[in-house]
């Protein structure tokens, strides 16, 4: 536990950013009938029947000291999906960083072995060399800021029917709502600081 707390005490360094990663899965449910909209004195009403549209895995990556977050959606929760998320983090979001200090829980897919399963050895080594991994202790995942962000996201926008993943705007609206309710954590507009990507 002290290891993770020591990492959080480090000052902000763009060359060695402290990034937290966590994931959760959500069932995608669509309405079978259009809900009745909000009216004066009456909340929105939804039919209790729904249609199952599968499950989506949400990777949430955040850099707390910068106020940046991203949600990445995938169809599965495998080593390959985690490796793809980490590759995107390194190559797209932190290409100039010397090393990324990555805090995450001890899920079996959260290891350099996943990189070697997903990519050729040279590429896996390149990605692994860019990471400084710190795992939260067992039963201590509450130390991971990404888990706290996922909890807030769950309470504010994932606790209702998500609809159909083929409607990309819906996810952006829900994340925008979450972003709007957390203005103290993000100083720049949603379009440049937070986003949803689907893979």
Report each predicted region and the residues it spans.
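Extended, low-complexity cationic-aromatic segments
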Residues: 1-87, 186, 190
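Short beta-strand segments
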Residues: 19-21, 101-104, 134-135, 174-177
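Conserved RecA-like P-loop NTPase ATPase core
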Residues: 22, 61, 105, 144, ...
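C-terminal domain-tail junction helix/linker
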Residues: 32, 164-199
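RNase H-like polynucleotidyl transferase catalytic core
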Residues: 44-50, 123-145, 161
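Active-site proximal helix-loop segment of RNase H-like, two-metal nucleases, encompassing DDE(D)
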Residues: 69, 138, 146-161, 165-167
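Acidic/histidine-rich, metal-coordinating catalytic segments
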Residues: 97-110
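Short, aromatic/basic amphipathic alpha-helical patches
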Residues: 113-124
């Amino acid at each position: 536990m002290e290891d993770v707390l020591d990492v959080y005490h480090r000052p902000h360094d763009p060359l060695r950013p402290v990034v937290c990663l966590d994931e959760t899965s959500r069932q995608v449910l669509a309405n079978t009938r259009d809900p009745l909209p909000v009216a004066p004195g009456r909340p929105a009403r939804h039919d209790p029947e729904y249609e199952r549209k599968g499950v989506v895995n949400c990777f949430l990556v955040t850099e707390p000291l910068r106020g940046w977050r991203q949600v990445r959606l995938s169809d599965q929760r495998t080593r390959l999906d985690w490796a793809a998320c980490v590759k995107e983090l390194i190559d797209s979001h932190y290409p100039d960083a010397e090393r990324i200090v990555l805090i995450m829980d001890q899920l079996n897919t959260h290891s350099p072995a996943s990189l070697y399963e997903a990519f050729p050895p040279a590429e896996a080594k390149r990605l692994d060399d860019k990471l400084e991994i710190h795992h939260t202790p067992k039963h201590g995942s509450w130390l991971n800021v990404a888990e706290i962000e996922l909890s807030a996201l769950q309470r504010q926008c994932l606790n209702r029917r998500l609809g159909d993943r083929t409607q990309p705007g819906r996810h952006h609206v829900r994340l925008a709502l979450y972003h709007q309710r957390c203005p103290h954590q993000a100083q720049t507009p949603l379009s440049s600081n937070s986003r949803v990507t689907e893979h």
